[in-house]
């Protein structure tokens, strides 16, 4: 029985599979259906994310994983800042029946120290987050989709009738 968080974390890490950042880079190149998930909080993601990663804060991972990857045998790689939260997340996903989950040892900090490429996605401002809240909660749109809409050029012709706020959300 774990007597401290450190003991508990050691116990968790002993029960999951961890890979190095170099292993992850190799997996990204070779494993066609690999899903990489960043479990950090949005403000942490502003410092850069691993290319192609899905951004799902740890607090929402278990709720959203079936939408992201319904196949419980598909390969998943989880990372956070240092590898601790991703290890805990890997344990939780294993308990949900996901059988091919790895945690990236050292997290994005180790990725950055290794000189591997990070993406710096454009994020919504606080005002935009409030304005587009109704769209961003939809899994089909989310923050990524809303950011794409903001970057797009849109022409609205004859949409809706008088008083119809069709273009309000664009």
Report the location of each language-model feature.
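Rhodanese-like catalytic fold shared by cysteine-dependent sulfurtransferases
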Residues: 1-35, 42-75, 82-147
């Amino acid at each position: 029985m774990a007597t401290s968080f450190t003991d508990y974390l050691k116990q968790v890490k002993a029960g999951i599979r961890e890979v190095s950042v170099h292993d992850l880079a190799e997996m990204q190149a070779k494993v066609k259906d690999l899903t990489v998930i960043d479990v950090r909080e949005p403000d942490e993601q502003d410092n850069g994310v691993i290319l192609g990663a899905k951004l799902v804060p740890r607090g929402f991972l278990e709720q959203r994983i079936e939408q992201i990857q319904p196949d419980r045998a598909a390969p998943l790689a989880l990372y956070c800042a240092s590898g601790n939260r991703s290890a805990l997340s890997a344990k939780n996903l294993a308990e949900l029946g996901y059988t091919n989950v790895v945690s990236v040892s050292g997290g994005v900090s180790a990725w950055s120290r290794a000189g591997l490429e990070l993406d710096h996605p454009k994020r919504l401002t606080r005002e935009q987050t409030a304005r587009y809240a109704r769209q961003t909660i939809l899994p089909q749109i989310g923050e990524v989709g809303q950011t794409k809409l903001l970057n797009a050029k849109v022409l609205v012709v004859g949409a809706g009738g008088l008083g119809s706020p069709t273009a309000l959300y664009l």
